[in-house]
């Protein structure tokens, strides 16, 4: 089948993205296999003030949510703008990828991606200051994500 014809039958919302967890314990093939079977989603671009209840309210519209793990700043132990949403079934997770990715939550456009499965310790930000790496180098002022970036100089 031609690549154009394949694109017509592809469900780009459900396809596995190019992103790979650099801290995954295993090889790329093993990670790819887990992602294709996963029922867990990574959710990014959340406000630091978004609650677990708000996440549940939105994501439960796509199916039965098993659990939500809010991402925490590893130093302050406060929310740092991401979470994991685990569903009971792959089908429900696929529905969330189709219908929730790119929507607004707490006045922010959120993004979802497949996750190979939550492991203890992954709920913490990986940035040097304890939060997410992307927030350390952000140059714009974003009050919903802690103001200015932590590493860049402020005006």
Swiss-Prot record:
Secretion signal span: none
GO terms assigned for molecular function: mRNA binding; RNA 7-methylguanosine cap binding; snRNA binding
Subcellular locations according to the entry: Nucleus; Cytoplasm
Record-listed mRNA binding positions: 19, 42, 111-115, 122-126, 132-133
Coiled-coil boundaries: none
Record Gene3D superfamilies: 3.30.70.330
Biased segments, Basic and acidic residues type: 133-143
Record region (Disordered): 122-155
RRM domain mapped to chain residues: 39-117
Listed GO biological process terms: mRNA cis splicing, via spliceosome; mRNA transport; nuclear-transcribed mRNA catabolic process, nonsense-mediated decay; positive regulation of RNA export from nucleus; regulation of translation; regulatory ncRNA-mediated gene silencing; RNA splicing; snRNA export from nucleus
Annotated TM spans: none
Primary localization class, coarse: nucleus
A Pfam family this chain is assigned to: RRM_1
PROSITE patterns per the UniProt record, alphabetical: RRM
The keyword Transport belongs to this UniProt entry's keyword annotation: yes
Role: Component of the cap-binding complex (CBC), which binds co-transcriptionally to the 5' cap of pre-mRNAs and is involved in various processes such as pre-mRNA splicing, translation regulation, nonsense-mediated mRNA decay, RNA-mediated gene silencing (RNAi) by microRNAs (miRNAs) and mRNA export. The CBC complex is involved in mRNA export from the nucleus, leading to the recruitment of the mRNA export machinery to the 5' end of mRNA and to mRNA export in a 5' to 3' direction through the nuclear pore.
Name of the protein described by the UniProt record: Nuclear cap-binding protein subunit 2
């Amino acid at each position: 089948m031609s690549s154009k014809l394949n694109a017509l039958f592809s469900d780009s919302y459900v396809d596995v993205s190019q992103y790979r967890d650099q801290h995954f314990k295993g090889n790329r093939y093993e990670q790819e296999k887990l992602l294709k079977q996963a029922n867990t989603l990574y959710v990014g671009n959340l406000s630091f003030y978004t609650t677990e209840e708000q996440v549940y309210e939105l994501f439960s519209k796509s199916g039965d949510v098993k659990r939500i793990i809010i991402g925490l700043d590893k130093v302050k132990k406060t929310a740092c703008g991401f979470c994991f949403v685990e569903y009971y079934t792959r089908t429900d997770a696929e529905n969330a990828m189709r219908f929730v990715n790119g929507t607004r939550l707490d006045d922010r456009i959120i993004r979802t991606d497949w996750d190979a499965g939550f492991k203890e310790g992954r709920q913490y930000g990986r940035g040097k200051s304890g939060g997410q790496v992307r927030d350390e180098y952000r140059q714009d002022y974003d009050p919903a994500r802690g103001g200015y970036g932590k590493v860049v100089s402020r005006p």
